[in-house]
């Protein structure tokens, strides 16, 4: 898992441009996005517990927060966890299991995909797994 915050990290080559009309803040730069969707979660909602063989997924947090979990497929590594909040972008590469659990009411995020994801392609590159969320199996 890789992540950055659009308001505090400039290492991604992102820019912020301000004039009398307001501000434009880059979320991505030189990314080949094939799909984007807006997702709203209730408190405690769980999403994910899957991976994609060919798709890179970007999750951009608009409001609220959620715990983001990731681990490589067929790996003995421990699950990584990260508290994602407004402005954070989390990148899940192919063959990286990812899951999320909402911690605040009204968590809204946009999921972007490089690869098949929406319309007729929905779930064609999604492989479900048992929960990787820490504490779910205790």
Language-model features: locations:
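A short, N-terminal "cap"/entry segment at the start of jelly-roll beta-barrel domains
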Residues: 1-34
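A generic "binding-loop/recognition-motif" signal
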Residues: 20, 54, 96-97, 105
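Short beta-strand His + acidic residue motifs that chelate non-heme Fe in jelly-roll/DSBH
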Residues: 24, 49, 68-69, 92, ...
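Glycine- and acidic-residue-biased ligand/ion/polar-headgroup-sensing regions
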Residues: 54-73
């Amino acid at each position: 898992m890789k992540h950055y915050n659009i308001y505090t990290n400039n290492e991604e080559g992102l820019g912020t441009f301000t004039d009398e009309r307001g501000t434009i803040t880059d979320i991505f730069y030189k990314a080949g996005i094939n799909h984007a969707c807006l997702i709203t979660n209730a408190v405690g909602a769980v999403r994910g517990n899957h991976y994609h063989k060919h798709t890179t997924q970007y999750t951009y947090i608009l409001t609220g927060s959620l715990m983001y979990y990731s681990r490589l497929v067929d790996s003995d590594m421990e699950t990584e966890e990260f508290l994602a909040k407004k402005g954070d972008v989390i990148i899940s590469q192919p063959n990286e299991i990812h899951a999320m659990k909402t911690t605040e009411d009204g968590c809204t995020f946009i999921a972007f995909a490089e690869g098949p994801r929406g319309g007729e392609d929905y779930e064609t590159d999604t492989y479900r797994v048992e929960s990787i969320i820490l504490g779910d199996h205790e």
